[in-house]
Amino acid sequence: MPQAVAGPEIERLIQLLGRMPGLGPRSARRAALQLIKKRETLLAPLADAMRVAAERIVVCRSCGNVDTSDPCTICRDETRDPTTLVVVEDVSDLWALERSGAVKARYHVLGGVLSALDGVRPEHLTIARLVERAGEPGVKEIILALNATVDGQTTAHYVTESIKPFGLTVTRLAHGVPVGGELDYLDEGTLTAAIRSRTAF
């Protein structure tokens, strides 16, 4: 076992940073050193922001987004299209779509995808709440913005069947060639999806 090179408080900081996705032990040490070097301008404000976040962050009971208010900022935004619900796997997907500016609708965060391998069943997700929302007056379209994985496709089919009685339009994101992509570098599955979802030019 490697010997500790600093006091327990610094070692704890390194260990906690190392739990972050994409940060291994070496990256965690580098991040900790940067925080320590910039104690006044970075470490103290970050610690304060994290304390406030831990106290105030809540999950929106309507859509599943995280915010400091319930309902969340997006659900309270009256400029959004109330006829469309965009279904995403996780909050990170919601944030990605918001950054793109491509859609100005309401969202529904499932909290994951169905997975027989991982034992994730419909009751582990917010599918029942989605069905309730799909039945609300004025809702006309459900956009399935789920990842193009086997579990994502399984979840999309399950959701589609669950909301079928409402007679809503159900669409999903197009799959295929990314903007700026070269065909030679794409895998066969992506090329097949691109051919099948081709559109008029």
UniProtKB/Swiss-Prot annotation:
| Biological process according to GO | DNA recombination; DNA repair
Every copy of the Toprim domain together lies at 83-178
Instruction: Supply the Gene3D superfamilies for this chain.
Output: 3.40.1360.10, 6.10.250.240, RecR Domain 1
Q: Which InterPro entries does the record cross-reference, listed alphabetically? A: DNA_Rcmb_RecR (IPR000093), Rcmb_RecR (IPR023627), Rcmb_RecR_Znf (IPR015967), TOPRIM_dom (IPR006171), TOPRIM_RecR (IPR034137)
Give the boundaries of each C4-type zinc finger. 60-75
Q: Which UniProt keywords apply?
A: DNA damage, DNA recombination, DNA repair, Metal-binding, Zinc, Zinc-finger
Q: Which GO terms describe its molecular function?
A: DNA binding; zinc ion binding
Keyword Ribonucleoprotein tagged: no
Q: Does the keyword Zinc-finger apply?
A: yes
Q: PANTHER family, per this entry?
A: RECOMBINATION PROTEIN RECR
As for family, the record states:
Belongs to the RecR family.
Q: Report the protein's function.
A: May play a role in DNA repair. It seems to be involved in an RecBC-independent recombinational process of DNA repair. It may act with RecF and RecO.
**Stated name of the protein:** Recombination protein RecR
Q: Which organism is it from?
A: Methylorubrum extorquens (strain PA1) (Methylobacterium extorquens)
Report the gene name. Answer: recR
